[in-house]
Each structure stands twice: as structure tokens, then as C-alpha cells.
Amino acid sequence: VTTTQSELAALIDEYLQLVFAADPIEATQLGIHDYDSTLGDYSAEAYTEQIAKRQVFLSRLQAIDTDKLDADARMDHQLALIDVRTALRRLQDRAIWMCAPYWYVEQLGVAFSALMRDDGQSPATQAERLWARLRLAPSYLETVKSNLTSITAPLHVEMALTAIKGLRNFLASAIPGFAAQLEETLQNDLAHATAGVQQALDEFERFLHEFHDHATGSFACGPEHFDYLLKHYHLLDLDHRQLRDFGLAQMAEDKAAQ
């Protein structure tokens, strides 16, 4: 293993620590349990800090001499670049955190459900971590209110309202079902925390109904961003027009073959 490859491996490990600390929910989904008791910091200040840190990692990755890497390391380097660049694109150009209320609601559902699956941890351990996340949910939703701006698309507000209904049903059924295997104290803790989340969702729903009239953005990402994803994320040598033409040609072939 060359020094350059060792440096790359250490840099990627450092970057992953940043990613998981910034997104504990994703970490839990991947089986990394160091952050299970948190939801993460979704404040505007935290996003600004994330952008700055990712820009530093991008510069450090670009400074790696890929000629000194073997094939596997070059692939790791390419994947790391794709992840950093795409993350920066979402945070800066698309500003998803300022205009996707549905995503925030969906994140909560994932944050809770990921701690109730069978992954080798004891139910009591999972319950303690679930309880911690449930108690953090009301402040999380308050932060979301502060983040959302008029660039939000009305459709995305409507999607969030629909997502709230689904999350309510999940809280009312899945969590009591999971808690049934626990001792009574933990059952009561989860029930009390769940009630707090339900109340916070009621308040967030009222906020979204009022916010809807102020949401004037478009749900479309635009051709430039779409082309960026095709080229730099999906690694396709096609722009949106060429992809459309390819799809139409395939449909015509399929129809002719029927």
C-alpha cells in the first residue's frame, strides 16, 4: 500500500465520520450505531458549517495524485468525489434543506423505524435510543419551521402534509407494537414521548397550512441540475434531451415488438 493510498483511506474515513455525524439517521440505516440517540443538527448554522467542511474535503480529495493509486483506490477516490460534489450541489445550489418539508417528515419516520428492526441489538437498547429520538422530534420540527423559505414549492408542502398522516399512523401502530415486548417502564416512556411527537406534528401541520400560501417555488430541478446529475452522479454521457430521445426510441421499439 502506497503512502498516497494510505492518505486516501484515512481521508475517506475522516469524511465518513463527518457524514455520519451530520446525518445520524443515515448512519443508523447503514448499521452504524454511534449516533442512534440523536437526530442531528439541522439548523442553518449547521448546514453552513457542513458546506464549509465538505468544500475542504473536496479540495483535499482533488489534491490526491491518482496516478499513484491502484485500480480499487482510484474507484474509491472517484466515488468519494461524486459523493462530496453531489452533497455540495444539494446543499448549495438546490438548498434542499430550505425547501423540502416532506423530506424532513420522512426523515423522522426513518429515524424511528430504523431503530425497531432486528439487527442484533437488544430490544431494550433499541428502545432507549428510540426514546431519545422521540424526545428530540419536537425541537427538530421547530428547527424545520425556521429553515423553510418561500423557495419551497406548494407541491412539496402538500407532500409534507400527506407524509404527516403516514407518520401519525406509524406512531400510533408501529411503536406500541414494538413496545409490547418491553418492560412496563420503557413502554410508558415510549408512549409519553410518542404523544409529544404527535402533538408536535399537529403544530407542524398547522404551520404548513399557513405556510402554503407563502411557498412560491418550483418543484422542478431544472435542466442544468438534471444534466449535472446525469453526468457526475450517474456517470452517463447523455444530457436530458438525449435521455428523453433514448427513452422514446426504446418505447417505440417495445411497442413495435408487441
Indicate residue ranges for each PLM-predicted region.
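N-terminal maturation segment of proteins
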Residues: 1-258
